[in-house]
């Protein structure tokens, strides 16, 4: 049953996710591609976490943050990808009201934690390059734990505002969500109640997270750039730039897609374009992050070689 009679209203008890496409051939192709991406995402991020845990050379603050980023990337992708894969296999993919709220909240939680972790990693690079003598004091084990715990608390608070908004919506008519997961915009379109307050609350909450984290990242890299330009050694400049390149690439990809989805006016792009960008944001980027951080990081590449060497000679 998709609807439940409640007094003068018909309450929606489940939703239908329309997914990415109706074409049977395209569905098979997309299923194969996204399944491969998801498997690479899980294996790549798990490998990153395990490598950092077993390699004493990687027991540094930067890699502590990176291990949590890998965990969050797996969570972000897993909040939507398995259900999306099911959508390709069934004729009509339904999701219950409660399951929709959980998916909605998890996507908001992991997306928010990623923002805070990227900001924490930018601050870590700022201290390492601009104040190297104070690095061990400012980025202590206790400080790292506080920054990570703060990131998860921030994610929980922002996700709570999204979930509370979801439960304030009244769905009494159409139940077809034109997306591959329960996102805010299509849910707002389906609601038959006044959503103005809820939209303001979620916009303020998500907007605050974005502004705060972007500000921290921008200020950190402004000081980093100034410090690098003042360096007289070409080798020192190259080393400083190389430590920041991976993180800057990840930040650009992540915030670039967030800007397209949540900041640009909805009239400037179609729903289908939004779906494609959402796939990149929630499915592709979590796969790319381990590759971005490992391919340009000599310490990680060295740790991989050492672990492979141990396996070969055991």
Swiss-Prot record:
The chain crosses the membrane at residues 29-49, 58-78, 103-123, 137-157, 200-220, 241-261, 275-295. GO terms for molecular function: G protein-coupled receptor activity; olfactory receptor activity. Glycans are attached at residue 8. PROSITE patterns: G_PROTEIN_RECEP_F1_1, G_PROTEIN_RECEP_F1_2. Residues 1-28, 79-102, 158-199, 262-274 are extracellular. It is a multi-pass membrane protein. GO terms for cellular component: membrane; plasma membrane. This is Olfactory receptor 5P69. Potential odorant receptor. Belongs to the G-protein coupled receptor 1 family. It is found in: Cell membrane. Disulfide bonds join 100-192. SUPFAM superfamilies: Family A G protein-coupled receptor-like. Its main location: membrane. One of its GO terms (biological process) is sensory perception of smell.
